[in-house]
Curated annotation (Swiss-Prot):
It comes from Haemophilus ducreyi (strain 35000HP / ATCC 700724). Pathway: Cell wall biogenesis; peptidoglycan biosynthesis. InterPro entries: Enolpyruvate_Tfrase_dom, Enolpyruvate_Tfrase_sf, MurA_subfamily, RNA3'P_cycl/enolpyr_Trfase_a/b, UDP_GlcNAc_COvinyl_MurA. The modification 2-(S-cysteinyl)pyruvic acid O-phosphothioketal is found at C117. Its EC number is 2.5.1.7. One of its GO terms (cellular component) is cytoplasm. This is UDP-N-acetylglucosamine 1-carboxyvinyltransferase.
């Protein structure tokens, strides 16, 4: 199993080119199933989850070509299979997004119940009940969700009992080829939903209201080819801003938009960081100052993103003062805290809240990653700890951060990937 060896403490400073957003690329890739003509996508990140999505699409009969510049050509005009198999789906919960476009275009689809990060219950119930309201017939059989429809899906008014990014995207995809109009109420508002809507509209869909809590989709009989540029990854952006903030550095994130990160930037400024923005970049300068502790409460967009909670837990671990970090989106998303405590952090978990008393210096340790965002916080902790830190189970990082060690080295980190031999693991 691969691990990272990280040496510290080092100041992390420089310029980082931000990759395309994983959380936009995945639904957009699955949405290509809807198109009867070829699609061209740019700024597609090179990630394990993207590779898994390619494998699922190819299993369905989609033709995919990718060049060295991240341009992906996709042709879904000759899909002949309608099953996303367990051996691929088990590693990635986003695989459920294959179901809606399959049943919308081909009136049938099967997806194995998905896997992914182990951070609490992420049921697919809202995906299923929404499709049923649009006329799909759903069966759960031997670990598979099977959806069929007698002809086109029907437009419907769908109220989301809980704000759900995944279910909002599923309904939006399904509704593009449904008969009549669909209205999603209490819809998620994330920037990745807006980007997916832009992509679908470029294919000929008619979607309005994306980015608000009410989205309207007027169904079309067919969708065509298009070109689309994947939006920049706001979570990668926020992660590198935190990297500078905890290490006394100065960093510029290029090719990214500040308006997708308002809550994060506000908290960084509250922590005493100087943050300046341009149309396509964000710069954070610590001025050599230790961050001040900030209280965090995760919320659906435009609130503070749950995918930045682990990084800000680390920031608060080395900040001046005491903070409260409340996680309202997912269960079990504090699994990084015991690992940070092994490195000398002082954090206690009380229900869905962590109380963190900042320390001046972290210590090196052997730690284990438990999910994507927790794992990057442990790597960054190693960058500022005094000595050598080993981070195990780094496959989580490869699911969501493109070329992470190369990018970290460019801003001053001392990090290497290695594979522990079987004999040394015994």
């Amino acid at each position: 199993m691969e691990k990272f060896r990280v040496h510290g403490p080092y100041k992390l400073s420089g310029t980082v080119d931000i990759s395309g957003a994983k959380n936009a690329a995945l639904p957009i890739l699955f949405a290509t199933i809807l198109a009867e003509e070829p699609i061209s996508l740019t700024n597609v990140p090179d990630l394990k989850d993207v590779d898994t999505t390619f494998k699922i699409l190819r299993k369905l009969g989609v033709v995919i070509e990718r060049d060295a510049n991240g341009v992906v050509q996709i042709d879904a005009s000759h899909i002949q299979h309608y099953v996303a198999p367990y051996e691929l789906v088990k590693t990635m919960r986003a695989s459920i997004w294959a179901l809606a476009p399959l049943v919308a275009r081909f009136h049938q689809g099967q997806v194995s119940l998905p896997g992914g990060c182990t951070i609490g219950a992420r049921p697919v119930d809202m995906h299923i009940t929404s499709l049923e309201k649009m006329g799909a017939i759903i069966e759960l059989d031997e670990g598979y969700v099977k959806a069929t429809a007698n002809g086109r899906l029907q437009g419907a008014r769908i109220y989301m009992d809980k704000v759900s990014v995944g279910a909002t995207l599923s309904v939006m995809m399904a509704a593009t080829l449904a008969e009549g109009s669909t209205i999603i109420e209490n819809a998620a508002r994330e920037p990745e939903i807006v980007d997916t809507a832009h992509f679908l509209n470029a294919m000929g869909a008619e979607i309005s209201g994306a980015g608000t809590d009410t989205i309207t989709i007027k169904g079309k009989e067919r969708l065509t080819g298009c070109q689309h540029h994947i939006v920049a990854d706001r979570i990668e952006t926020g992660t590198f801003l935190v990297a500078a903030a905890i290490s006394g550095g100065k960093i510029t994130c290029q090719g990214t938009k500040a308006d997708t990160l308002d809550a994060v930037i506000e908290k960084l400024r509250e922590a005493g960081m100087e943050v300046t923005v341009t149309e396509n970049s964000i710069t954070l300068d610590t001025k050599g100052q230790r961050p001040k502790a900030v209280n965090i409460r995760t919320m659906p967009h435009p609130g503070f993103p749950t995918d930045m909670q682990a990084q800000f837990t680390l920031l608060n671990a080395v900040a001046e003062g005491t903070s409260r970090i409340t996680e309202t989106i997912f269960e079990n998303r504090f699994m990084h805290i015991p690992e940070l405590n092994r490195m000398g952090a002082k954090a206690e978990i009380e229900g869905n809240t962590a109380i963190c008393q900042g320390v001046e210096q972290l210590k090196p340790a052997e730690v284990m990653a438990t999910d994507l965002r927790a794992s990057i916080s442990l790597v960054l902790a190693g960058c500022i700890a005094s000595g050598e830190t080993i981070v195990d189970r780094i496959y989580h990082i490869d699911r969501g951060y493109e070329h992470i060690e190369e990018k970290l080295r460019r801003i001053g980190a001392k990090i290497e990937r290695f594979r522990e031999s079987a004999s040394s693991a015994e």
